[in-house]
Amino acid sequence: MLNDHDRIFTNIYGMHDRSLKGAMARGHWDGTAAILGNGRDWIIEQVKASGLRGRGGAGFPTGLKWSFMPKQSDGRPSFLVINADESEPGTCKDREIMRHDPHTLIEGALIAGFAMGARAAYIYIRGEYVREKEALQAAIDECYEAGLIGKNACRSDYDFDVYLHHGAGAYICGEETALLESLEGKKGMPRMKPPFPAGSGLYGCPTTVNNVESIAVVPTILRRGGAWFAGIGRPNNTGVKLFAMSGHVNTPCVVEEAMSISMKELIEKHGGGVRGGWKNLKAVIPGGASCPVIPAHLCEDAIMDYDGMREKQSSFGTACLIVMDQQTDIIKAIARLSKFFKHESCGQCTPCREGTSWMWRVMERLVTGEAEVEEIDMLFSVTKQVEGHTICALGDAAAWPIQGLIRHYREEIEDRIKARKTGRMGAMAAE
């Protein structure tokens, strides 16, 4: 359990004043000018020492990512882009930061931008996040009026602007290069890499793309020291993290907890337990819709961090759990996710464009039991042909949930096919 004095987000539930005055009263924007005065190299070294990894799902070391930006300008401006396009089913943590604690993000953007020599930050917010956009824009306006950003930000002789861009609802724009394309006014389709954004990103200029939570935790890390953050959790999985729980828990929520907390403790302590008790648990998707499902017997000792989820043949992702009880039709649940990825594919890569549609059609047949048993292996084979063969990771995201389903629930799939053939499906439906 995380100690209260180690918490970074002081208003995640919106119980306090989210204005600049309220944020300052809770300790935000405290000594920001002094932090900037320590210089770019000090900031990046502290972030590296903290062990902070990207909170958007990939888990790339944040300090290392910042260090890829050019130290000296070649005449092109540098930019920080904040990915607030939180569009994956089950993921709902960043919206709480933007809606209730927006000043953590803006202060973090200023410090991160300074560390990378960026001229401005662009916050790309999900199209459906209307109230979040209003709260964030109001906070940005407050900071401009107070002189915290803009010309001579925080009286540091550093000019830094923050722009808020409202997306149009495309999931694919959550991929960093598709996001950059969208910001430039083009169709949101991922770019080939290299060149990477740090070399040629927004408008062909050096750019770093970070998740909302990754940026929002930076000011507190620098105030308390990288060693403090590194002392929470376990090696390679350090710090505090926002976890979300939805589905069949008694109290769905977003909560700030220490990394490496056990899944069972997280669900029992903060989610109010599984609906009907822990024995009624069927499966958990641990980090948003793109992560392979984990069956109940593996959830008993599952550790919620990058390494812990890898050991369970899944992924930590965004740490937003989707909990499913024994009454869940797991095949139908994964088929619904398959439909989402099919719908959101941009169509640029053939394996993803054709593969997601094909996988969804087979999944629909598995739901009704109309498929043949041989199609299970064929479906798994197709997921492997899609995985790793696309420009971006949407192909992987579409393949992994299906792989997890077949890996752990093959017997249930086969039983449904046999039930259809023997007429048991009609009897089951009647019950």
Curated annotation (Swiss-Prot):
Cofactor dependence is on: FMN; [4Fe-4S] cluster
Q: Which InterPro entries match?
A: ComplexI_51kDa_subunit, NADH-UbQ_OxRdtase_51kDa_CS, NADH-UbQ_OxRdtase_suF, Nuo51_FMN-bd, Nuo51_FMN-bd_sf, Nuop51_4Fe4S-bd, Nuop51_4Fe4S-bd_sf, SLBB_dom
Q: How is the cofactor bound?
A: Binds 1 FMN.
- Can you name one GO molecular function term for this protein? NADH dehydrogenase (ubiquinone) activity
State if NAD is listed as a keyword. yes
Residues annotated as binding [4Fe-4S] cluster: C346, C349, C352, C392
Q: What catalytic activity is recorded?
A: a quinone + NADH + 5 H(+)(in) = a quinol + NAD(+) + 4 H(+)(out)
The entry marks the following residues as binding NAD(+), namely G54, R55, G56, G57, A58, G59, F60, P61, T62, G63
Its top-level enzyme class, in one word, is: translocase
| UniProt binding sites for FMN | 167-214
- Which keywords describe this protein according to UniProt? 4Fe-4S, Flavoprotein, FMN, Iron, Iron-sulfur, Metal-binding, NAD, Quinone, Translocase, Ubiquinone
Q: Which Gene3D superfamilies match?
A: 3.10.20.600, NADH-ubiquinone oxidoreductase 51kDa subunit, NADH-ubiquinone oxidoreductase 51kDa subunit, iron-sulphur binding domain
Its domain of life reads Bacteria
* Record-listed E.C. numbers: 7.1.1.-
Biological function: NDH-1 shuttles electrons from NADH, via FMN and iron-sulfur (Fe-S) centers, to quinones in the respiratory chain. The immediate electron acceptor for the enzyme in this species is believed to be ubiquinone. Couples the redox reaction to proton translocation (for every two electrons transferred, four hydrogen ions are translocated across the cytoplasmic membrane), and thus conserves the redox energy in a proton gradient.
The family classification in the record reads:
Belongs to the complex I 51 kDa subunit family.
Name used for this protein in its record? NADH-quinone oxidoreductase subunit F
Q: What is the lineage of its organism?
A: Bacteria, Pseudomonadati, Pseudomonadota, Alphaproteobacteria, Rhodobacterales
